[in-house]
Amino acid sequence: KEQKTIDSLSYKTIHINPKAVVDEVNLFTEKLSKNGYLSSKVIQERKANDSTFVFEFSLGQKIDFIQINTQKASFLRENKLVEKDTITIAFSETESFMNQLLHQLEVRGFSTSGVKLTNFSTDKNILKADLTENITAARHLDDIVVLGYELFPKGHKKQLKKRYRKKVFNKQILSELYDDVQKFVFVNQIKAPEILFTKDSTKVFLYLEKSKANNFDGFVGFSTDENDKMVFMGYADLVLNNLLNSGEQFKLYWKSDGQEQQTFDFMTELPYLFETPFALRGNLNIFKQDSTFQNTRTNIELGYYFNYNTRAYLGYSSMESNDIQNTNSLSLNDFENKFYTLSLEYFYPNRTDFLFPEKIRANIKSGTGNRVSNFDNNRQFFVSTEAFNNFYLNQKNIIHLKFQGYYLESDSYIISELYRFGGINSIRGFTENSLQANLFSGIMAEYRYVLAQTLYVHSITDFGYFQDQASGFNNRLLGLGFGLGLYTNGGLFNLVYANGSTDGQEIKLSNSIVHISFKASF
């Protein structure tokens, strides 16, 4: 019977040296103890030949249950961690039971406290023991110290301390702190946070370094217009994060096709103003449509950070539109509008995934105001939204779903105030900003397959619907295609081939568009 029990427990029979043999015997003895054979021992060991060792064990009485007396564990009893005077459990569950008690103490802030079993005795197959405790003072997080990046933004550090200081300290709090720091795209955590327990304080040390959080994508070319004048063409997309070590962000976007459209957009955001949860964001956007019209929009917003990735903004927006050709018609004329806006934003980064650094993003913005044109004065309301999520079926198969929507309510519409869309960041297969609408909704779907840690391919299936009441036109949109993404030391390269068509229009290869981008990180 004892031999059958021994054979049921796995052990290695081949070893590289005598020391490994002794280690295996000790490990096997420990296995016997965990299975209830506390009095097991080696009663004979012999060397059969130069390479064979034989050990004979006596198992003794097996312990099936443990009976734990809790009367000496007053703190555990007072806090309802144990409620009975005597607890009887299977002996194999002893380690799990003790670990659960330690976990419950740790969750309550008693990280340096301990429990143990003493005064052992046996009664046939039952082991009896007393549960004793060593309870130290509850731990609270007293300070957060940043090492490695001495110029870490003061506002961000203060808000971290404000959120976590004096909280009951446990592993969950440490994990939440780590996750919150991961949301700062401008820093890397060199290693996991470390804890320093002193007699009267608990400190957490963060080991940080400034990351390459800036991106640039673009090219510049030259061409001639119909009058043989040289014009610039190309685009530039620049994002600067934490350039001044205050956590600020600057975005600059410029695009010109040399003929029909020119776009200039500049945005800056200053977070944690005066080390408070408030932020300031400003934006200037200039859009010119050939020789038809030019729009100049300015936005100023005061933001509040509930936490770093959840924000709300109150803002004021104004736009001036010039009818360049002085058409002065109901559908195209000079106007000005002003809106008071409310925005909500949420994002969840995925810093460990180089190919898809953001898992979730959701933005919604609404505004109410009025438009004054050469013909009328209209009250207006708008709402715009964009949201996406990466659904990980597993590490290699990912479904990316994105929704975009826009609605402008007005008694009348002017062409130059309509929402413009189409292109790589919207319905793919259409020229950038070639579509316009007062109502638009679109769903963009991708099936992504990761070929390697730095390479993936994906399908493209985009659906959209829009209404253009200024032109009395509405239609459905379809974009189909495929693409790939490649992460290099320099940045992320994307190639997209997409074909766009409208409802009732035959899909033609001649309508296909290739989108290429390379975001360099520095």
Model-inferred region functions:
Residues 1-11:
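Short N-terminal segments immediately surrounding and downstream of signal-peptide cleavage
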Residues 10-224, 235-237, 251-258, 265-267, ...:
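Periplasmic polypeptide-binding modules associated with outer-membrane biogenesis and secretion
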Residues 36, 60, 109, 136, ...:
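Glycine-centered flexibility sites
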Residues 149, 354-356, 455:
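A generic short alpha-helical patch detector that favors 3-5-residue windows
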Residues 170-363, 391-393, 420-424, 433-437, ...:
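Gram-negative/organellar outer-membrane beta-barrel architecture
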Residues 237, 252, 265-267, 360-522:
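C-terminal transmembrane beta-barrel domains of outer membrane proteins
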